[in-house]
Amino acid sequence: MSKSENLYSAARELLPGGVNSPVRAFTGVGGTPLFIEKADGAYLYDVDGKAYIDYVGSWGPMVLGHNHPAIRNAVIEAAERGLSFGAPTEMEVKMAQLVTELVPTMDMVRMVNSGTEATMSAIRLARGFTGRDKIIKFEGCYHGHADCLLVKAGSGALTLGQPNSPGVPADFAKHTLTCTYNDLASVRAAFEQYPQEIACIIVEPVAGNMNCVPPQPEFLPGLRALCDEFGALLIIDEVMTGFRVALAGAQDYYGVVPDLTCLGKIIGGGMPVGAFGGRRDVMDALAPTGPVYQAGTLSGNPIAMAAGFACLNEVAQPGVHETLDELTTRLAEGLLEAAEEAGTPLVVNHVGGMFGIFFTDAESVTCYQDVMACDVERFKRFFHMMLDEGVYLAPSAFEAGFMSVAHSMEDINNTIDAARRVFAKL
C-alpha cells in the first residue's frame, strides 16, 4: 500500500470519512485521496514523493501559488509577537483599510474566520436590517454550510446528491427560496409571490460550486434591479471570486453594486479568514453599534490578518490579473483543441483565474440543469488519468479549477499535452 492509502485507512477510523471536509475524500471521483506532504509554487508533493501541477489551489486561496515568501515571512513575523490576543490590533485596522480601498462598495467590513461565517452573518444582518425572514438563493450555488443555505446547494452537497442536508429543520428551510441561476424570470416570480417578505438575494457572481458557470450579461444587473424594486438587499458572495476574477471582484468585472459583499479564501492568503461588509447604514446595524449580533473568539486573528494583508498587497500589484487571465485562457483553449482532436465533446468555461471542464454535447453550460446533464462518469475517468499524468484537478465534476500566477506557460502546455494523451485513451 502507498503512504496515502495507509494514512487514509488510519484517518477513516478517526475522522468521519477520513477527512475534515467531504470533497477531499474523493467521493466525487472514487479512489484514495492524496495526502500532501508540502507545496511550493504551482506544485503539490504527496507523501509518496510524487509532484503534481495543482489546479485546486487549496480550493481558491492560493492565487499567488503555494508557500509565497511574502506571506510566509509575514506569518513568521506576526507569530513572533503572539498568536492571539482577543483584543483589537493595528493590523485589523490596516487590513480593513486595504479591503475597503480594493472593494469600493464596502464602506465597512467585519472580519470573521471562514466564508460560511461571512455568508451566515451577512444574511442575519440583511434579515435584521429589513425586518424580513425569507431569502433567495440559486440552485447549485454553495454559500457555506449554514442551515438556511444548505437548500439545493452546490459543492460537496451537490456531489452527495442531497437537495437538503439532514439536520436542517423544515422550519428553517421554508424561508429559503431557490431560483434558477441565470433565470431572472424565476427570481421575479419569487418576489411577486412574497413581495414584502424577502430580505435578500445571495448569489455567487460566478457560480463556482457547480463547476464554473459565469453569469449571462443581464443576470446580475437584473438582480440589482429586482432588489431595488422590492426593497431587498443584494448580497454578492465573492468568497471564491473576490480578488481573483478582478482586483475589486466579480462585482467590478460585471459592473454591479451590491449592498453587502462576502469574502474569504484569498483574503486570508491561506489562513482561515472570511469577511463581510458593505453599505455603512446596513453595517451600522451590526453589534456593538446596532442590534444584530455577531461575534468570534478568533475573528481578526493577528496571524491571519498578517497573512491576508501580505497576500492582498501582492495581488494588487500591476499585471497579476492579466497574467491569471492569460494563463487560464491558454489552458481553456488548449484543452478544447486537444479534445476536438480526439473527438471528445467538451465545454470549458473560464473567467479570470477560474475555469470549469464539462463533458457534454451541449454548445454551452449556463445553468444548474446544464451542469447536471454533463457526463460525470467520463469526468471521473479523466480526473484519475490526469492524476496519473501528474496533474491535480478538483476531485469533483462540480468544482471549479483555479489558476495561480505561480503557474508558468510551461506548466500550462504540459497540462495540455497530458490532456491530449488522456483524451486519446478516454
Curated annotation (Swiss-Prot):
GO BP field: protoporphyrinogen IX biosynthetic process
EC class (word): isomerase
Keyword Isomerase (UniProt): yes
Source superkingdom: Bacteria
A GO term from the CC aspect: cytoplasm
GO-annotated molecular function: glutamate-1-semialdehyde 2,1-aminomutase activity; pyridoxal phosphate binding; transaminase activity
Listed Pfam families: Aminotran_3 (PF00202)
EC number(s) on file: 5.4.3.8
Recorded metabolic or biological pathway in which this protein acts: Porphyrin-containing compound metabolism; protoporphyrin-IX biosynthesis; 5-aminolevulinate from L-glutamyl-tRNA(Glu): step 2/2
InterPro entries tied to this protein: 4pyrrol_synth_GluAld_NH2Trfase, Aminotrans_3, Aminotrans_3_PPA_site, PyrdxlP-dep_Trfase, PyrdxlP-dep_Trfase_major, PyrdxlP-dep_Trfase_small
Statement: the UniProt record of this protein carries the keyword Transmembrane: no
Stretch forming the signal peptide: none
Keywords: Cytoplasm, Isomerase, Porphyrin biosynthesis, Pyridoxal phosphate
Stated family: Belongs to the class-III pyridoxal-phosphate-dependent aminotransferase family. HemL subfamily.
Protein's name according to its UniProt entry: Glutamate-1-semialdehyde 2,1-aminomutase
Species this chain originates from: Shigella boydii serotype 4 (strain Sb227)
Lineage: Bacteria, Pseudomonadati, Pseudomonadota, Gammaproteobacteria, Enterobacterales
Protein encoded by which gene: hemL
